[in-house]
Regions:
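Switch/communication elements of ASCE P-loop NTPase nucleotide-binding domains
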Residues: 1-47, 273-398, 570, 581-599
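Conserved P-loop NTP-binding catalytic core
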Residues: 40-128
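Short glycine-/polar-rich loops that comprise or flank the Walker A/P-loop
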Residues: 81-85, 130-134, 173-177, 312, ...
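Electropositive, glycine-dotted interaction segments
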Residues: 92-211
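Acidic, Mg2+-coordinating catalytic modules of nucleic-acid enzymes
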Residues: 394-407, 411-599
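Conserved catalytic network of the ASCE P-loop NTPase/AAA+ motor domain
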Residues: 19-20, 30, 75-80, 125-129, ...
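Conserved beta-strand position immediately N-terminal to the Walker
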Residues: 24-27, 178, 405
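Extended helical coiled-coil dimerization/tether regions that scaffold
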Residues: 189-192, 199-297, 301-313, 476
Length: 599
C-alpha cells in the first residue's frame, strides 16, 4: 500500500498543502517548515489508534490555533474551522480490496490522476489500478465544547447524499501505518500501552488472547504479606482503627496488598520490558538502556512488524539520526528502502540523505505564510544521480537545506572563506552571520563543475554565489556561469594563494611564515628556509608555494585569522559583502505599550 497524494488543510503549521509521492519519500527542509506535520497528518488519517484518544485533536492542531471563524454579521455564532487531511492510496492489499470494494476508484498510472466517473468503465489493467481515497475531518463542537475528528471514505456510494461512510478502526489496522517519533516513541515503544509498538506486535501475533486474564489471576494469588511478615501487625492495626469508624461484616482479613490495581489498563502502564545487553549486566527496564540502543530496539520492533505485513506497512519516521551513530543511520535507511512498501522519513543527516535517490527526496519550502510546497530533487536539473550520491555527504545535503550557497573550486577557498566571514561578522554587528542566514559553502572541486552545481541549487530555490579563478573562457562558457549565479565572481588571480600573496601585506605574510617556523613545522618538507628572505617578491613566491602545498591543512584560513582588518584581501572581502546584501539582519520591532521598558 502506498500514499500517492496527500492534501492537508488547516493542520498545525500548514494552512494548505497538496503533495504527490511515488514510493519512498525523504522529507528535507529547514526547521519548522512542516516535515513532522506531514507525518502527524498521516498518523491522524491512517493511524488506527490516534482518533481513539480523547480528545483526538486540540486547539493547537488547528492552523495558528484558529478553530473558530469570527461571525461576519454581529450577533451570529462563529463558524467552526475544519482540519482536513486527505490521502489517495494505491497498491492495495487483497484484504483491503475485498473489504473496501464499494469505495474503490481508479488511478491512471502514467498520468498520475484519478479517473473521472465517465472513464471508469474504460479502466484497463496495466493502465489504471484500484485506489482508495480517505479523508479525516476535525473540528470544534461548540455545543459540547469538544474537539472531534473522524475518518471517512470519500467515495461513499451507499451513503445518504451529502454524507460519507466512516472508516472503522479494524479497517485502519489493515493499512499497517506505523509512526516512529524521534523524541516520543522511545519512552513507550516497549510498554504495553494501547497503540505502542509492542502492543501492535502482540496484536498481530495474537499473543494477547488470554494474556490479561491469566496475568490478573496469577497476581491475585501472589501473597505479598507472606513474604514480608513485618507487614502483618501494620495491616492489623489499620483494620482495627478502620472498624472504629466503618463497621465491616467480612470475616477474617479485610485488607490486601497487590502489585497493581489488577485491571487491564493499569497493567498496561505498569508492565515493563527488561533488557540486558552485556554479560556483566543484569536486565534493567528498557528505558534505562542507552538512547542509541533504545532507538535501535524500536527499529527492531518496527522491522518485526513490517515482516509480518510485508505488503501493507507504511512507515513514518522522524529524524533517525537523533542519538544514533552514522552506521546505524545507514542501516535504518537501507532497511526502510528495501523492506517496506513505503517510508516517509524526515532527516537532516547526510548519512540518511545519501541513501535516498533524488526521485525519492523532497525539499519542503513555504510558498506563503501557511502554504507548503514540495519539490522533488530529481526535478532540479543539471545533476546526475552519481554526482548526487558522491557529493551528498560532502556538503550537498547541508546546502540543500539552506537559503544560499557559495560555490568554490577548491579546498583552499572552502576553508578560507568561512574564516574570513567570521572575522568580518565579529567586527561589524550590522552583518547578518552567513551561517545563521542559511548560507553554506560548497566545494565543486573544479571551476568547470560550478555551473552544474549552481544550476542544481538554483532549481531548488537557493541563491547561488560563485567565486573562482580567472581563466581563458569563451563567451559560451562565461554565459553558463552568468546564467546560474546570483553573484558571479571570477577574480583576476590564477589561484586563491596568488590573491593572498598579492593583497595581504608582506609584513603579515612574513610574520605568518615565521610563526610556522616557530611552531616547529617541518621547514625542509615545505621548503621554508630557516632564515626568511628579505626580498618582498621572494616572500610572496614562498607564501604561494607553501599555501599551495598544504590545501588540506587550511593554512590559508590560519593566515586570514592572523590578519588585522586592514590586511585582509580586498577581492574576497568585497565578494562576501555582496552576499551580505542578500541576507540583511532581520528587523526587530521594539516593544510598545505598557509592557515596553524605558531606560
Amino acid at each position: 500500500m502506498k500514499v500517492v497524494q496527500l492534501k492537508i488543510e488547516n493542520f498545525r503549521g500548514i494552512e494548505s498543502a497538496e503533495l504527490k509521492f511515488d514510493g519512498h519519500a525523504l522529507l528535507v527542509g529547514s526547521n519548522n517548515v512542516g516535515k513532522s506535520t506531514i507525518c502527524e497528518a498521516l498518523d491522524l488519517l491512517l493511524g488506527p489508534d490516534r482518533l481513539n484518544r480523547f480528545p483526538p485533536i486540540e486547539e493547537y492542531d488547528f492552523y495558528n490555533g484558529r478553530y473558530l471563524q469570527p461571525a461576519q454579521v454581529e450577533g451570529e455564532d462563529p463558524t467552526p474551522v475544519k482540519i482536513r487531511v486527505e490521502a489517495l492510496l494505491t497498491d492495495l492489499s487483497a484484504e483491503v480490496l475485498k473489504r473496501c470494494a464499494k469505495h474503490l476508484e481508479f488511478w491512471h498510472i502514467a498520468e498520475k490522476r484519478l479517473l473521472t466517473e465517465g472513464e471508469v468503465k474504460a479502466a484497463t489493467p496495466g493502465i489504471s489500478i484500484p485506489c482508495l481515497r480517505l479523508e479525516t475531518v476535525g473540528e470544534y463542537d461548540p455545543a459540547e465544547d469538544e474537539f472531534n475528528a473522524e475518518t471517512f471514505y470519500i467515495h461513499s456510494p451507499d451513503a445518504i447524499e451529502g454524507e460519507k461512510e466512516t472508516v472503522r478502526r479494524d479497517i485502519k489496522r489493515l493499512f499497517g501505518f506505523l509512526y516512529l517519533r524521534a523524541l516520543r516513541t522511545g519512552s513507550r515503544a516497549l510498554s504495553l500501552e494501547r497503540g505502542s509498538l509492542l502492543d501492535v506486535l502482540l496484536r498481530l501475533q495474537k499473543v494477547r488472547t488470554g494474556l490479561w486474564e491469566q496475568t490478573i489471576s496469577r497476581l491475585k494469588g501472589l501473597d505479598i504479606e507472606n513474604d514480608a511478615a513485618e507487614l502483618e501487625p501494620v495491616l492489623t492495626a489499620i483494620e482495627e482503627r478502620l472498624s472504629s469508624y466503618v463497621p465491616a461484616s467480612k470475616a477474617g482479613r479485610k485488607t490486601k496488598l497487590y502489585v497493581s490495581q489488577l485491571t487491564r489498563e493499569h497493567l498496561r502502564k505498569t508492565m515493563a520490558f527488561f533488557l540486558a545487553m552485556r554479560d556483566d549486566q543484569e536486565a534493567v527496564p528498557f528505558q534505562q538502556a542507552g538512547t542509541g540502543t533504545l532507538n535501535t530496539l524500536v527499529l527492531a520492533l518496527l522491522s518485526f512488524i513490517a515482516e509480518l505485513k510485508p505488503d501493507s506497512v507504511i512507515f513514518a519516521m522522524e529524524e533517525p539520526e537523533i542519538t544514533v551513530q552514522p552506521h546505524t543511520q545507514r542501516r535504518i535507511a537501507d532497511y526502510l528502502l528495501t523492506h517496506t512498501k513505503q517510508a516517509f522519513v524526515t532527516s537532516h543527516s547526510p548519512y540518511v540523505i545519501e541513501r535516498f535517490t533524488p526521485e525519492n527526496t523532497f525539499l519542503l519550502a513555504r510558498a506563503g505564510s501557511g502554504k507548503l510546497e514540495a519539490m522533488c530533487v530529481a526535478d532540479a536539473t543539471g545533476l546526475k544521480e552519481n554526482d548526487y550520491k558522491r557529493y551528498s555527504r560532502r556538503g550537498l545535503s547541508e546546502c540543500m537545506l539552506g537559503k544560499g550557497v557559495i560555490i568554490v573550486e577548491g579546498s583552499t577557498e572552502y576553508h578560507a572563506l568561512p574564516v574570513l566571514a567570521r572575522c568580518l561578522e565579529g567586527e561589524d554587528s550590522a552583518l547578518n552571520p552567513l551561517d545563521l542566514a542559511g548560507v553554506s559553502i560548497f566545494d565543486a572541486e573544479s571551476d568547470s563543475q560550478i555551473p552544474k552545481f549552481a544550476k542544481f541549487f538554483q532549481a531548488l530555490g537557493l541563491k547561488t554565489f560563485g567565486f573562482y579563478d580567472v581563466k581563458q573562457r569563451d563567451a559560451t562558457e562565461k554565459a553558463k556561469f552568468a546564467a546560474v549565479l546570483d553573484v558571479n565572481e571570477e577574480h583576476k588571480y590564477k589561484g586563491f594563494e596568488q590573491m593572498l600573496a598579492a593583497e595581504v601585506p608582506v609584513t603579515r605574510l612574513r610574520a605568518f611564515l615565521q610563526d610556522l617556523l616557530d611552531s616547529g613545522v617541518d621547514a625542509a618538507h615545505y621548503k621554508i628556509p630557516t632564515t626568511l628572505p628579505t626580498d618582498d617578491a621572494a616572500i610572496k613566491k614562498l607564501i604561494v608555494n607553501v599555501l599551495s602545498s598544504t590545501k588540506g591543512a587550511g593554512w590559508s584560513a590560519r593566515l586570514l585569522e592572523q590578519c588585522q582588518s586592514s590586511e585582509r584581501p580586498t577581492t574576497a572581502v568585497e565578494f562576501l559583502k555582496k552576499i551580505y546584501t542578500y541576507f540583511p539582519l532581520p528587523v526587530v520591532t521594539p516593544a510598545t505599550g505598557a509592557s515596553a521598558q524605558t531606560p
